[in-house]
């Protein structure tokens, strides 16, 4: 007897439904939500941990998996190689160039996001002009560790983002055993966002410990919850929608550190309306990017 992928998915769906899982929470290969109608945009992705010797080859791998899951477009950031603390301008430029190469090769499947190290403020502003103001990128981030995002060193970068209406994706975590030096938490994001109420800041991973992260950012309306990069546990998406409203929740995967399937499942399997799922899976990110995409004449 030959058992194919479709048979396995149907059997899994039937088993889950029999155990009380709602039918609309189970995605099968025939699920219309995976046919592109949800217009899924992944707001948090990287080229690391993937097969391929060039950015173009690695992006081709992602595109094959995107097609299987009905993912229309990625917002692609640094991470081609293992993360380097205190990255130099040369290292940052190399990472940004790799992203732009991947996007240039697949312009209908990805947009680029700018990697920066706030330790070098002058270079950050120069790189913003090179890659966003005068280049193809449309977002800032994922800004990672080394400098807390609540630091004044971020202020000039955020002001540049505001000047072109580009959102910022800021890495955050709340670790039980303490964060790395310079690694931001959602508290730092809130402090930064309050100083810059016209900025749109995506709280990367929502701090990992999302039950706390959601509550921390709740009152700060220009901060958005990022679903990326944690286990696909039940309740994350539902709590974010309940506490923030679906308009402030954004789907991302953190691929290649996580799979598309496990992260999309957080949304498709959530007990929320299809309308809310459409906002989270792409509508909200397109709304945030609309000004810069329109200014650059890019598709949304």
Question: What are these model-predicted stretches?
Answer:
Residues 41-43, 76-77, 113-115, 141, ...:
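Active-site neighborhood of phospho(di)ester-bond hydrolases with catalytic His/Asp-centered motifs
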Residues 2-39, 43, 55-73, 245-248, ...:
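Mid-to-C-terminal alpha-helical segments outside catalytic/metal-binding sites
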Residues 72-73, 82, 89-170, 174-176, ...:
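Active-site gating/metal-coordination segments in enzymes
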Residues 40-50, 169-172:
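Histidine-centered catalytic micro-motifs
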Residues 46-57, 83-88:
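Acidic/histidine-rich helix-loop elements
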Residues 31, 135-139, 147, 151-250, ...:
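Catalytic pocket-lining loop regions of alpha/beta-barrel enzymes
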């Amino acid at each position: 007897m030959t058992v194919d992928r479709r048979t396995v998915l149907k059997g899994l769906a039937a088993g889950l439904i029999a155990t009380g899982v709602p039918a609309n929470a189970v995605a099968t290969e025939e699920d219309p939500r995976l046919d592109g109608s949800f217009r899924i945009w992944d707001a948090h992705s990287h080229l690391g941990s993937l097969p391929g010797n060039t950015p173009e080859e690695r992006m081709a791998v992602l595109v094959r998996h995107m097609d299987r899951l009905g993912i229309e477009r990625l917002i692609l950031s640094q991470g081609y190689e293992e993360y380097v603390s205190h990255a130099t301008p040369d290292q940052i430029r190399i990472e940004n160039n790799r992203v732009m190469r991947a996007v240039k090769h697949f312009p209908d499947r990805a947009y680029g996001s700018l990697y920066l190290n706030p330790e070098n403020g002058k270079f950050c502003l120069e790189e913003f002009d090179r890659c966003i103001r005068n280049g193809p990128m449309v977002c800032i981030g994922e800004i990672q560790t080394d400098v807390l995002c609540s630091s004044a060193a971020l202020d000039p970068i955020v002001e540049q983002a505001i000047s072109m209406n580009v959102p910022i994706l800021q890495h955050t975590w709340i670790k039980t055993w303490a964060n790395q030096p310079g690694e931001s938490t959602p508290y730092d994001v809130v402090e930064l966002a309050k100083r810059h109420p016209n900025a749109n800041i995506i709280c990367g991973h929502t701090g990992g410990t999302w039950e706390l992260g959601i509550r921390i950012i709740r009152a700060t309306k220009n901060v958005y919850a990022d679903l990326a990069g944690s286990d696909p546990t039940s309740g994350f998406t539902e709590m974010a929608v309940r506490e923030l409203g679906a308009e402030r929740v954004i789907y991302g995967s953190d691929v290649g550190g996580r799979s598309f399937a496990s992260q999309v499942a957080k949304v498709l399997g959530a007990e929320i309306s299809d309308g809310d799922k459409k906002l989270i899976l792409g509508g909200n990110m397109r709304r945030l990017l609309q000004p810069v995409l329109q200014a650059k004449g890019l598709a949304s």
